[in-house]
C-alpha cells in the first residue's frame, strides 16, 4: 500500500481532469496537496472535494516569476507533479511563431523552471520525487501539433538529463506519458471520431484520468525509489515502446 503521509505534493494543472485526479489520489494516500492552476473557481471546487490538508495556489505559468514564486512559497516540498499544459493546433505551414513559442514557453520552459526550483529545495532534504506529464505524441508525433509534440518530447529529454544530475541526492525524476484519456475534449468528439481512435487502442477503450493518477502515485512513492529517468506509458497499448 502506498503511503504518502507526511509528504507535501505540488500538482500543477490541478483544475483539469488529469490534474484533479492526481491531486485527489495523492491526498487520499496521505499527502498534503498544493493544488495549482490558473482557474481559481475550479481549484476551489477541487478543494471542496478533498476537504482538508490542501493549499490552493493560483499561478499563471506564462509568467516565469510566478513559476519561481510557486515553488518558493512551499515551506516543504517532497513531490512535484508538472501536469499543466496548453495546445495551439494547426498545420506547421500555418503556425505562427507566437503559437509555437507560447506552447513551448508553458509546456517546456515553465516546467523546467518548476523542476529547477523544486530541485534546489529538495536537495536540502536529500529527498524528492518529480513527475513530469508528457504525452503519447511526444513519442509518436501528431499532424497539426508540431509545437505540442516538440514540447512533450522536450519534457522527456529534460527529465532524463535532470535524473542524471540529481540521482545522488535522493531525488528521482520521471515522466508519465498518457495516451487518449477521457476528458471534456474527447467528449466533444462524434461517434465516428471516437470509434476511429478506439480502433487504434488494443485495450479497446479510452483511459481514465485515474489511470494516469495511479502511475503518478507509484512514481511518487518509496516503492519507486529505484526508478528514475524513465517514461511510463499509460495508453492502452496504442503505442508500444
From Swiss-Prot:
EC number(s) from the headed UniProt entry: 1.1.1.100
Top-level enzyme category: oxidoreductase
InterPro entries: 3oxo_ACP_reduc, NAD(P)-bd_dom_sf, Sc_DH/Rdtase_CS, SDR, SDR_fam
Keywords: Fatty acid biosynthesis, Fatty acid metabolism, Lipid biosynthesis, Lipid metabolism, NADP, Oxidoreductase
Keyword Transferase: no
UniProt-recorded Gene Ontology molecular function terms: 3-oxoacyl-[acyl-carrier-protein] reductase (NADPH) activity; NAD binding; NADP binding
Catalysed reactions, as listed in the record: a (3R)-hydroxyacyl-[ACP] + NADP(+) = a 3-oxoacyl-[ACP] + NADPH + H(+)
Keyword NADP: yes
CDD domains, A to Z: BKR_SDR_c (cd05333)
GO terms (BP aspect): fatty acid elongation
Active-site residues, Swiss-Prot/TrEMBL: 148 (proton acceptor)
Binding site residues for NADP(+): 13-16, 38, 57-58, 83, 148-152, 181
Pathway participation: Lipid metabolism; fatty acid biosynthesis
Domain of life: Bacteria
Gene3D superfamilies xref list: NAD(P)-binding Rossmann-like Domain
Binding annotation for substrate: 135
Subunit description: Homotetramer.
Family named by the database record: Belongs to the short-chain dehydrogenases/reductases (SDR) family.
The protein's role, per its UniProt record: Catalyzes the NADPH-dependent reduction of beta-ketoacyl-ACP substrates to beta-hydroxyacyl-ACP products, the first reductive step in the elongation cycle of fatty acid biosynthesis.
Protein name: 3-oxoacyl-[acyl-carrier-protein] reductase FabG
Native organism: Rickettsia conorii (strain ATCC VR-613 / Malish 7)
Amino acid at each position: 500500500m502506498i503511503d504518502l503521509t507526511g509528504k507535501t505534493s505540488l500538482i500543477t494543472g490541478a483544475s483539469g481532469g488529469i490534474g484533479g485526479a492526481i491531486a485527489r489520489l495523492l491526498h487520499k494516500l496521505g499527502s498534503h496537496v498544493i493544488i495549482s492552476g490558473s482557474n481559481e473557481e475550479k481549484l476551489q471546487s477541487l478543494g471542496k472535494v478533498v476537504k482538508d490538508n490542501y493549499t490552493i495556489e493560483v499561478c499563471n505559468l506564462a509568467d516565469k516569476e510566478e513559476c519561481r514564486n510557486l515553488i518558493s512559497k512551499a515551506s516543504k516540498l517532497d513531490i512535484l507533479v508538472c501536469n499543466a499544459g496548453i495546445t495551439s493546433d494547426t498545420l506547421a505551414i500555418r503556425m505562427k511563431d507566437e503559437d509555437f513559442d507560447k506552447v513551448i514557453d508553458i509546456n517546456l520552459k515553465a516546467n523546467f523552471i518548476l523542476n529547477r526550483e523544486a530541485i534546489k529545495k529538495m536537495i536540502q532534504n536529500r529527498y524528492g520525487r518529480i513527475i513530469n506529464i508528457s504525452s503519447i505524441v511526444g513519442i509518436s508525433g501528431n499532424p497539426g501539433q508540431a509545437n505540442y509534440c516538440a514540447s512533450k518530447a522536450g519534457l522527456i529529454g529534460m527529465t532524463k538529463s535532470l535524473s542524471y544530475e540529481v540521482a545522488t541526492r535522493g531525488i528521482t525524476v520521471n515522466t508519465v506519458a498518457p495516451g487518449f484519456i477521457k476528458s471534456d475534449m474527447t467528449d466533444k468528439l462524434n461517434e465516428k471520431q471516437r470509434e476511429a481512435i478506439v480502433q487504434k487502442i488494443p485495450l479497446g477503450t479510452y483511459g481514465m484520468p485515474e489511470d494516469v493518477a495511479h502511475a503518478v502515485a507509484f512514481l511518487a512513492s518509496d516503492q519507486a525509489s529505484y526508478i528514475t529517468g524513465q517514461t511510463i506509458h499509460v495508453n492502452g497499448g496504442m503505442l508500444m515502446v
